[in-house]
Swiss-Prot record:
Assigned GO CC terms: cytosol; nucleus
Presence of the UniProt keyword RNA-binding in the record: no
Compositionally biased residues, Low complexity: 44-59, 75-91
Keywords: Cytoplasm, DNA-binding, Phosphoprotein, Transcription, Transcription regulation
Gene name for this UniProt entry: FOXO3B
Coiled coil: none
SUPFAM superfamilies, alphabetized: Winged helix' DNA-binding domain (SSF46785)
Protein name per the record: Forkhead box protein O3B
Biological process (GO), any one: regulation of transcription by RNA polymerase II
GO MF term set: DNA-binding transcription factor activity, RNA polymerase II-specific; RNA polymerase II cis-regulatory region sequence-specific DNA binding
Compositionally biased residues, Acidic residues: 142-153
Compartment annotation: Cytoplasm, Cytosol
Length: 290
């Protein structure tokens, strides 16, 4: 009986080592052990190589492409040369404050051309003594230009008189010019009496008493007077064929000439034909009737 039990495993009974699960597990353990041996051998070979490095005991293999290392080694001399040049260059000066601006003596202010200047008062030239004739014309004062002949403004002429005279004489010149303007206003036809320069010269040489006389007011227009050559005309910038008066001025004169200060349109036309020389030649009953 004992002999039969001892022989049973050999004949038909399977042990735990002969089971398929055990064989599969042993195969996996063998593969893991083989992988560990392979990794250890590779680590030993990499440690023996010159380019290997390790961080905290963990092996890191060298890079597969050493080209970037070559580029860094090639760039190193150029970077070293640039650093040497920067070290040789002098240190840049500290920036200047806005109040301490460095001026270049080569860029001094230049004299302006004639087209960009006007008669300015330069006290340094007025207070300085007479300069020799060899001085350039740019250093001398530019004379003031004369006004145009068409400009007959009293303010501009008074300003010219102030520039010519000085002290008490300038006041006399201004009074003379104002008196001359009043005479021109009173003259018939709106024209200046006599030539302009001759009248101004005569007014200046006539004495201060005649120039300082108060300006006389203009006489009021006479309603009944005919609008001929003796009629005073109002100065106006607009000049028509019959004179300096406008249509509104003629209508006002016609209404003021009537006793009751009321006229119809036909009566106004009749007054124009009878009083204004320009309408005398062109007026008739049909045109005056409107």
């Amino acid at each position: 009986m004992e002999t039969d039990l001892a022989e049973m495993p050999e004949k038909g009974v399977l042990s735990s080592q002969d089971s398929p699960h055990f064989q599969e597990k042993s195969t996996e353990e063998g593969e893991v052990a083989a992988l560990r041996l392979t990794a250890r051998s590779q680590a030993a070979a990499a440690a023996a190589a010159p380019g290997s490095r390790s961080l905290r005991g963990v092996h890191v293999p060298p890079p597969l492409h050493p080209a970037p290392a070559r580029e860094e080694s090639a760039r190193t001399p150029a970077a070293a040369g640039r650093a040497a040049k920067m070290a040789e260059a002098p240190a840049s000066p500290a920036p200047l404050s806005p109040l301490e601006v460095e001026l270049d003596p080569e860029f001094e202010p230049q004299s302006r051309p004639r087209s960009c200047t006007w008669p300015l008062q330069r006290p340094e030239l007025q207070a300085s003594p007479a300069k020799p004739s060899g001085e350039t014309a740019a250093d001398s004062m530019i004379p003031e230009e004369e006004d145009d002949e068409d400009d007959e403004d009293g303010g501009g002429r008074a300003g010219s008189a102030m520039a010519i005279g000085g002290g008490g004489g300038s006041r006399t010149l201004v009074s003379g010019l104002l008196l001359e303007d009043s005479v021109r206003v009173l003259a018939p036809g709106g024209q200046d009496p006599g030539s302009g320069p001759a009248t101004a010269a005569g007014g200046l040489s006539g004495g201060t008493q005649a120039l300082l006389q108060p300006q006389q007011p203009l006489p009021p227009p006479q309603p009944g007077a005919a609008g001929g050559s003796g009629q005073p005309r109002k100065c106006s910038s607009r000049r028509n064929a019959w004179g300096n008066l406008s249509y509104a001025d003629l209508i006002t004169r016609a209404i003021e000439s009537s006793p009751d200060r009321r006229l119809t349109l036909s009566q106004i036309y009749e007054w124009m034909v009878s009083c204004v020389p320009y309408f005398k030649d062109k007026g008739n009953s049909n045109s005056s009737a409107g």
